[in-house]
Amino acid sequence: MRLLPLLLIPAVLEGDGRWSAAAPLPEPIQELSAAVLHDKIYVAGGIDRTGQATATAFRYDPAANHWERIADLPSPRHHMPLAVVGDTLYAVGGLAEPSFVPESTLWLYREDRNRWEPRAPLPAPRGASGVGVVSGKLVVVGGWGAGRQLIAASAIYDPATDRWHGAAPIPTPRDHLTAAAARGLVYAIGGRPLNPDRNYDIVEAYDPASDRWTRRSAMPSRRGGLAAAVLDGAIHVIGGETRGSVFANHEVYDPATDRWTTASALPVARHGLAAAAVGGKLYVIGGGPKAGFSQTDAVDVFAP
């Protein structure tokens, strides 16, 4: 499908808010992801302090400020997005091994039985991708596949039928992007073309109803290895890296106005981090405080 042009009027405004610290992760992990199910934050996979892929998974209760370990993933994964559809948590694809091999697995977490179960695999292996949820379906965009080649094809999973189908390709293929769903669209934000020296500020929005992409206002900074979460209808985009440094940037996109604001920076700059919003607050979890392989157990909480 062709990319539809929009009239873009860049605007970057300053925002307010404050950060505080929450209970740290039980162990330092980078390249992990997070999602919210029943007002609790789940994280799974990542790269641990030994530099190896991990299968560990944890659940955080914001009300109690407490982490607990849940069932391990069936296999170690990193750069694996998590997403929730209805009452179900999904872990999508990801990378395995220190050599970053892409995988096609789709797992769901059975909260009642504390176990992970397989579902129909992705049409092709992919990791370092982004996932958004619209109309009860997973929309997977970007990332790289076999041979460390960028993937343009988008894929949509319907839990009701346990089937995947193709969708319009992302106009700017990239890995290490972040994705978030808001107002019926999936926003693909930032990332890079396999090269941390060439980070993107690109924002493209996918509409499942029309199977079309549109370009939106660019992010104020160029970042890959970043995270995003939707809080009060706005998309908060946090962290990231270049080849030699990490970002504390915290920028907020309003889908209703197509405008960005710059919010209070992260207390601990990092990449490969996870983000989730619950209870009117933004939680930023783990990641790497140095470019490349590094890990932190820090959990920072932003209250607008």
Locations of the language-model features?
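Kelch-like beta-propeller repeat domains
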Residues: V12-P304
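Sec-dependent N-terminal signal peptides
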Residues: L3-A11
